[in-house]
């Protein structure tokens, strides 16, 4: 493919509005362009990469018997009302009316559509299991689109749905998908973790998220690709290294999720779902009597602890939430933070919001800063983190402005449901007893769910079992963020290319090292001087030979400065660069492996053989 015939609008500088490196490089390298807020056009390079990713997915899904189809993106609202999600999905749902004023939505996901299609076609257990998927654009009205393709209003997604007679059959397909996802992400060149995830608005019970790990900016060996003029990092002057470190640190670490994982085992979970090792303690302290003490102007845990000269770990934090329009009190040890997702999941609530001060006063008879669990009406549900159960003679609000209670003891002074509702902290013991918890940032690229009968119950998707009894279909759901993977791959494979000029000046610039299976082309073939007839003839000959051998070649035939061509080549990020330059008359060309920065001069007649050797282990 001639580069002059493609739309690759590279930029001289990083776009000023980009905060994460993947967004900046996709724009600068000419992969995407923003059409409006949260909506992007995928230009030829990005489209080629996405098509390669789709091919990988189709190959892996064929292995597990998944069948591709295509459902409409424009969906009737009636189905979503029937499932109950029209009201509960929230403001992210695109809602519209046709000319007859009938309600429609733009599909953010397709559980209802696939369930009803199968409901109307499948009547017997003999027709199951069934495993269907599609790859299409989805729509969510994000309040604040950001970070390029990571948070958009239109995005490309693969969503699959499996249908089963029982949970045992679902378990088999769920495991098949887990292995297929691992194969897809591995082939895509991603560093990832499969972690315990939250089902969220999808419903269901078990789920696993696949998170692409966002690399820290401190490992120079990972981020820098040195030109052959620089033997090693130690050869770069300290002042230049400091500049490079500042450049790396200037970009936000992308990934809206925090992953908690064990330092010694395979345990990994989204921070929203992560737990730590817990064991109840035996209380040895003598229970003190409740005592009301004045705590003037103390509105926070830290202020109360300082005023009473105690540790925050001996206080009870009292929060009020409104869960599906009902008040719920949440209790935590004073220095802990509530995990809203854990609390919402435990309650089985569709909506969970922090209460207003007015709502708190109606329940407690006091304002924020003085709330506590003692002497609340029996009608008020109290959910306490399990660590609260270990407290003895604690301090809590007295439900009287400006006062607190000392000598508060769980069970004696208040009754609660003790469960895990806190956010874990880095360094705590892993829940499996092996190692301690470490944190990393991650980009969610896939998610699989055991939906159970959540949608078949609400939509009446039933079959007759072997005894002729009507039973609900058991379902699984499996999603991959196709366009998100493009961002995640670039985030992990962005590099700073460092070189040294003949005058001894050090230069560095951003580019991409695309993994082979997702690179838009295999080889970037560059002619230094397109007006040199010998060089052009050699380029044409090489291009034909390479393509005959099955290589996908992008030939830079533009009449541009060689520096501009090399800069664009680094940005675009193809795995191999072949340069036809000054030695074209001798039949000599340069082959450069982008990932390592290594280069070698070879006779043009030996290019194919040399490539086979150089790429054997890549």
Swiss-Prot record:
Molecular function GO labels: aminoacyl-tRNA deacylase activity; ATP binding; catalytic activity, acting on a protein; proline-tRNA ligase activity; transferase activity
Example of a GO cellular component annotation carried by this entry: cytosol
UniProt entry tagged with the keyword Protein biosynthesis: yes
Subcellular location: Cytoplasm
Keywords attached to this entry: Aminoacyl-tRNA synthetase, ATP-binding, Cytoplasm, Ligase, Nucleotide-binding, Protein biosynthesis
Catalytic activity reported: tRNA(Pro) + L-proline + ATP = L-prolyl-tRNA(Pro) + AMP + diphosphate
CDD domains: ProRS-INS (cd04334), ProRS_anticodon_short (cd00861)
UniProt entry tagged with the keyword Cytoplasm: yes
E.C. numbers: 6.1.1.15
InterPro entries, A to Z: aa-tRNA-synt_IIb, aa-tRNA-synth_II, aa-tRNA-synth_II/BPL/LPL, Anticodon-bd, Anticodon-bd_dom_sf, Pro-tRNA-ligase_IIa, Pro-tRNA-synth_IIa_bac-type, Pro-tRNA-Synthase_IIa_type1
Family classification: Belongs to the class-II aminoacyl-tRNA synthetase family. ProS type 1 subfamily.
Domains (record comment): Consists of three domains: the N-terminal catalytic domain, the editing domain and the C-terminal anticodon-binding domain.
The protein's name: Proline--tRNA ligase
Gene source species: Streptococcus uberis (strain ATCC BAA-854 / 0140J)
């Amino acid at each position: 493919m001639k580069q002059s015939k493609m739309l690759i609008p590279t930029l001289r500088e990083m776009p000023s509005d980009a905060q994460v490196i993947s967004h900046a490089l996709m724009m600068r390298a000419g992969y995407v362009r923003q059409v409006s807020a949260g909506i992007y056009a995928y230009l030829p390079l990005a489209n080629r990469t996405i098509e390669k990713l789709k091919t990988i997915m189709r190959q892996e899904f064929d292995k597990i018997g998944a069948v591709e189809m295509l459902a409409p993106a424009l969906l009737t609202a009636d189905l979503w009302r029937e499932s109950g999600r029209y009201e509960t999905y929230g403001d992210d749902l695109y809602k519209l009316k046709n000319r007859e004023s009938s309600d429609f939505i733009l599909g953010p996901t397709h559980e209802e559509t696939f369930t009803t299609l199968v409901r109307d076609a499948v009547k017997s257990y003999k027709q199951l299991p069934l495993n269907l998927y599609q790859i299409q654009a989805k729509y969510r009205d994000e309040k604040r689109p950001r970070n390029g393709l990571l948070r958009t209003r239109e995005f490309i997604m693969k969503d699959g749905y499996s249908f089963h007679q029982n949970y045992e059959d679902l378990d088999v397909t769920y495991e098949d998908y887990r292995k297929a996802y691992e194969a897809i992400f591995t082939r895509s060149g991603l560093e990832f973790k499969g972690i315990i995830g939250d089902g969220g608005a999808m419903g269901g019970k078990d789920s696993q998220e696949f998170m692409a790990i966002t690399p820290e900016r401190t490992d120079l060996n990972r981020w820098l690709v040195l030109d052959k003029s620089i033997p090693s990092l130690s050869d770069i002057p300290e002042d230049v290294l400091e500049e490079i470190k500042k450049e790396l640190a200037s970009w936000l670490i992308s990934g809206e999720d925090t992953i908690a994982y064990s330092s010694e085992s395979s345990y990994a979970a989204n921070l929203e779902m992560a737990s730590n090792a817990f064991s109840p303690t035996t209380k040895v302290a003598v229970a003190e009597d409740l005592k009301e003490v004045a705590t003037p102007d103390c509105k926070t845990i830290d202020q109360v602890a300082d005023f009473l000269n105690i540790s925050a770990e001996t206080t009870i934090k009292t929060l009020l939430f409104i869960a599906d329009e009902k008040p719920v009190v949440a209790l935590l040890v004073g220095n802990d933070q509530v995990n809203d997702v854990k609390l919402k999941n435990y309650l089985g609530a569709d909506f969970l919001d922090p209460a207003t001060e007015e709502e708190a006063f109606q329940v407690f008879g006091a304002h924020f800063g003085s709330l506590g669990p003692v002497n609340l009406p029996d009608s008020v549900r109290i959910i306490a983190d399990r660590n609260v159960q270990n407290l003895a003679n604690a301090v809590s609000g007295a439900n009287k402005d400006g006062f607190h209670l000392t000598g508060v003891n769980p069970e004696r002074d208040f009754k609660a449901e003790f469960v895990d509702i806190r956010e874990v902290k880095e360094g705590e013991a892993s829940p499996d007893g092996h190692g301690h918890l470490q944190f990393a940032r991650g980009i969610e690229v896939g998610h699989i769910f055991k939906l159970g009968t959540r949608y078949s119950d609400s939509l009446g998707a039933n079959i007759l079992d072997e005894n002729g009894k009507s039973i609900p279909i058991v379902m699984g759901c499996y999603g991959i963020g196709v366009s998100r993977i493009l961002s995640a791959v670039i985030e992990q494979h962005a590099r700073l290319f460092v070189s040294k000029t003949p005058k001894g000046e050090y230069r560095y610039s951003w580019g991409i090292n695309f993994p082979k299976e997702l690179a838009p082309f295999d080889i970037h073939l560059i002619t230094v001087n397109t007006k040199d007839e010998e060089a052009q003839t050699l380029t044409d000959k090489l291009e034909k030979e390479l393509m005959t051998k099955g290589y996908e070649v992008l030939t830079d035939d533009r009449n541009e400065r060689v520096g501009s061509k090399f800069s664009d080549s680094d940005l675009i990020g193809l795995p191999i660069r072949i340069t036809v330059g000054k030695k074209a008359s001798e039949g000599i060309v340069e082959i450069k492996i982008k990932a390592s920065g290594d280069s070698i001069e070879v006779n043009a007649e030996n290019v194919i053989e040399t490539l086979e050797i150089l790429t054997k282990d890549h």
